[in-house]
Amino acid sequence: MNFLIVGTIRNCQRQIFQTIKCLDKGLYFANKIEYFFVESDSDDKTLDSLKKLSRQKKNFRYESFGRLRTKLPIHTQRLALCRNRCLEELKSKKNSWVDYLIVVDTDGVCRNINSQIIRKCISEKGWSAQTANVKGPYYDIWALRHNTWSPNDCWQATKKE
């Protein structure tokens, strides 16, 4: 099993190390793992952490869009640009080896990944995507806008309840 792990990253200078450690441990059974992260608008030392990881791990790469806030003031627009870059990376010919794409959060929510559960889920037939779950509100759903799936602003909906 070969995994390309991607994600967007901003202001995660410390959390990224724990995230990578967690993923390496949880996917120990993989034949191949490569990491690709897209950074923008960090105010901390995230870029230094990414540089350090890319020197330490041959399978770790990243790109930085620098300051997008001035060009794209809306957070979801910046996220979309960075996520689309991750998808472009997946589609590139150099990644034809990829069996599975894993999109991760890099802000410290990645903990205690159970490799047995991952293997079991992957072995199931008939799926195109699998998603993780967390306790409590999950902010990423806010970025999803679709006329059928999520036509409203989830935070506005929770305020009305």
Regions found by a protein language model. Give the residues of each.
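Conserved donor nucleotide-binding strand/loop of the catalytic core
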Residues: K51-R85, S92-K93
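Hydrophobic targeting segments
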Residues: N2-G7, L23, E34-F37
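Conserved catalytic core of nucleotide-sugar-dependent glycosyltransferases
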Residues: G108-E161
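Short, well-formed alpha-helical segments that are part of the catalytic scaffolds
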Residues: C12-L27
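Short beta-strand-to-loop acidic/aromatic patch adjacent to the donor-nucleotide binding site
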Residues: N95-V109
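Alpha-helix termini
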Residues: K25-A30, K57, E89-V98
